[in-house]
Amino acid sequence: MNLTGKWKKISKGECDKHYPDEIEFHEHPRFLGKKGPGQNFILWDAGGYAITDSDRVQIQIATDEQVPYQFSLSGDVLTFTDRDGCEFKYQRLE
């Protein structure tokens, strides 16, 4: 599964407010998150990631901790579920 590309968050839940409004996953497993209007702190600012299974990815969060997430890709919609059960979605921009 390939996460490479630019993504825009399309979910607006209370639990996902600390995840970036936009994120770009690079081929060399790095990512860069971008804050949206009114976002003060984002967990995914910049760092590394590793796909560890067909539906699991480990992402380096702002504290440098490596955190596992479940994910799925359906068409151009990428869905993540964090360890607290928060589900949030991104739409592929490019």
Which residues fall in each region the model found?
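N-terminal glycine/threonine-rich, aromatic-flanked beta-hairpin/loop signature
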Residues: 15-57
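N-terminal helix-cap/turn-to-beta initiation motif at the start of protein domains
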Residues: 1-6
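Beta-sheet ligand-binding and adhesion/scaffold domains
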Residues: 13-14, 22, 56-94
